[in-house]
Each structure stands twice: as structure tokens, then as C-alpha cells.
Amino acid sequence: MDRRVVITGIGGLCGLGTDAPSIWKEMREGRSAIGPIVTSELHGLTGTIGAEIKTLPEHDIDRKQLVTMDRFSLLAVLAAREAMRQAGLSCDERNAYRFGAIVGVGGSGWEAIEASYRALLLNGARRAGVMDVPKAMPSAAAGQVSMSLGLRGPVFGVTSACASANHAIASAVDQIRCGRADVMLAGGSDAPFVFCVVKAWEAMRVIAPDTCRPFSSDRRGLVLGEGAGMAVLESYEHATARGATIIAEIAGIGLSADAFNLVSPAVEGPEAAMRACLADAGLNVQDVDYINAHGTGTKANDRMETEAIKRVFGGHANSMSISSTKSMHAHCLGAASALEMIACVMAIQEGVVPPTANYREPDPDCDLDVTPNVARERKVRVALSNAFAMAGMNAVLAFRQV
């Protein structure tokens, strides 16, 4: 069995907005959410920038469930609920075992872990929180989504650094293609704004001091963000049978590994993932109109990704639109490619390519059309989403107009 898989609902929240429409509106307008972080979880750490969710949307999640959630799980549940509302779906005894969820996370449970560290080592507490372990496990977000919505089909977590959401979506597509499920919720979530995580990223010397400028010659690194993005995936037959509005089709998946270095990228792995994605979708290079680049804003990554795109697409590389929306929502780690999924499907829906914000100076090593600073109207029939994680774990998705 090899069923077509379509998207019928999307949900998200990040520094740009607390639902998918507001996120897309800010992307279209090229607005960046990057600024000073003010959360109390940084315990007085100053001079740190990021793309922070200032206020969570109103919700009716039961307090008993809330106290069992770390922030990354809460964000995933909020995004999943929005996606379900847009899809016009609910889960009940008739379909629960054919309806699952897969959520990718880059890191998990940071709030619970740091709170216990401070309580035990700094403040002399005798015991950790009773819910610290279930709060912190990487699969907690998927489990909380399942419990919140009553999903009893395939439910599990995925963690592969900043390719986590694309890997989660790819895994969900496979569940539907092989007939194990009819409907899946899939995406990613991350909430890295706690003291120890921010300091660890700063120690790597990849954090920009001002903002994220992907593909610009004066780029100085990435910027951290928090957020979640989720999509309702259905078999084409299931969606059409219930009269659902189809947003886009997930036409292809390409996965690969560099087998090279924990932190340095290699061009061959991303090249292989893009080629595999096109082959899986039955697409030619000329069919692709837009690539949402991994585009972290580091010198090495942006240079490598440009070269990989040129290798795969040849002369057509100069005809496509490319952009990195991390310039606006920052690098949301496990949630990054889920938010970029929203950018891809909305580009298809509205015929608008979101820009690479904060772009200032052309780089001869990154000389493709990166849609600098201003969104561009163009017909987008096929969009690719690139996610190239540390340790060389690569996941590329192809979205197609239906």
C-alpha cells in the first residue's frame, strides 16, 4: 500500500505569533521576532537575544494536565489543537486507533531539569520533583498531544536535533502510506530559553550577537527561538471522503546522514537527501519553485547548503526562489522545520515566497536568489523544506499543490 498523504490543518506558535495565520502574516511582511529575551528562566542573564513567545494564547487545558507538562509539551499541545480545529477533525472511539501523533524535539524537559538542579544543589532540597522524569522525556510532547486529544494510534517522539520535526513528519507520512493509520498529527516543539541551555549554546560560539542574517556576507551565526508547529496529515482518500479542505500534499521524503562530524556539515549528505526527496515524489528538478532553506546564518552551513542546492538543481538553481525564515522566527531547534512547513504550504496556498530578513550584503559563496528582505509573489506548485541537523542527520520534505 502506498497512499497519497495530504495536509488538512496546520497550527503553530513562536515569537512571530501564537497561531499559524499570524505567523504567516509576519513572515510575509518580513518582520523578525528576534530581540532581547526577558523570561525569568534566565535568572538574570542579560544581553541575550532570541525569538521568544511573549504571551501564550488563551486555552482551556485542565490544570491537572498543565502541572505535568514542561513548556515544550504545552507548546506542542497548543499547536496540535489549532491544527485539529482548522482540519475540522475530532477523535472518538470510532477512529481513535487509526489516529496517531509523532512530535519531534531537539531537547526536552529543560525547565524541569534546571528547576531540580537549583533546588537540589543550590537550595538544599532533599528530593526532586515527582514529575520531573515524565516531564523531561523526549516523548512527553507526543504523549501529551495524544492524551489531550484522545489519539490511540501510533504515538511516539522523535529527536534528531534541528531535523526533528521533518523526521517526525516523514515518520507520520510513512504510517499513513503503509496503512497503519488514516490520520496523523505531526510536527515539532522546543523551548530552550533556560539558563543552562542558553549558556551551552553560547559556549559553542555559533550564536550571533545581533540578529540572524542567513546568506548575507556579514552573517555571524544563529539565534535561538522557541515554538511549535503541527500539521494534520491524512490519506488523500480519507480527506476527500469527508470533504476536507486540502492545503497541500506531502509528495516526497528524502533522508540521509553525513557520517562525517558532530558539528561540521558535509555537502554530500544534504545533496543526497534532496535527490532522494525528488525521486520519492517523482519530481524533476525543474518542478521545484521554492526551497525553504535550513539557512541557520552560520558561515559554514549557508555556504554548504548553497553548494548542495547547486549540485542537485544545476542551472535551475538560479531560477528558484530560496529563503530562510529562521531570519524571522530564529532557530527553534526541534520546532524549526515544523514552522518552516507552515511557510512552505502557505507559499503554495497564496503564491507568495517569504523573504530572508535582515539580509545586507551579497556573499559570492551564497549567490542564489535568497529573496532578500521583501516577500515575492510567484506561483509555487512545489516547495522543498530542508533540515540539516548536527551529527549530519538530514531530512527534506517536498510539498505539492493539490
Curated annotation (Swiss-Prot):
The protein's Enzyme Commission number: 2.3.1.-
EC class (word): transferase
Subcellular compartments: Cell inner membrane
Superkingdom field: Bacteria
Gene Ontology biological-process annotations: fatty acid biosynthetic process
Catalytic site: C162 (for beta-ketoacyl synthase activity), H294 (for beta-ketoacyl synthase activity), H331 (for beta-ketoacyl synthase activity)
GO molecular function: 3-oxoacyl-[acyl-carrier-protein] synthase activity
CDD domains registered for this protein in UniProt: KAS_I_II
InterPro entries: Beta-ketoacyl_synthase, Ketoacyl_synth_AS, Ketoacyl_synth_C, Ketoacyl_synth_N, PKS_Beta-ketoAc_synthase_dom, Thiolase-like, Thiolase_acyl_enz_int_AS
Keywords: Cell inner membrane, Cell membrane, Membrane, Nodulation, Transferase, Transmembrane, Transmembrane helix
Coiled coil: none
Residues covered by the Ketosynthase family 3 (KS3) domain: 2-401
Pfam families: ketoacyl-synt (PF00109), Ketoacyl-synt_C (PF02801)
A GO cellular component annotation in the UniProt record: plasma membrane
Residue ranges crossing the lipid bilayer per the database entry: 329-348
Principal location: membrane
PANTHER family: 3-OXOACYL-[ACYL-CARRIER-PROTEIN] SYNTHASE, POLYKETIDE SYNTHASE-RELATED
Function of the molecule: Proposed to synthesize NOD factor fatty acyl chain. Involved in the synthesis of a highly unsaturated fatty acid moiety, which forms part of a lipo-oligosaccharide that is responsible for host specificity.
Similarity remark: Belongs to the thiolase-like superfamily. Beta-ketoacyl-ACP synthases family.
Name of this chain's protein: Nodulation protein E
Gene expressing this chain: nodE
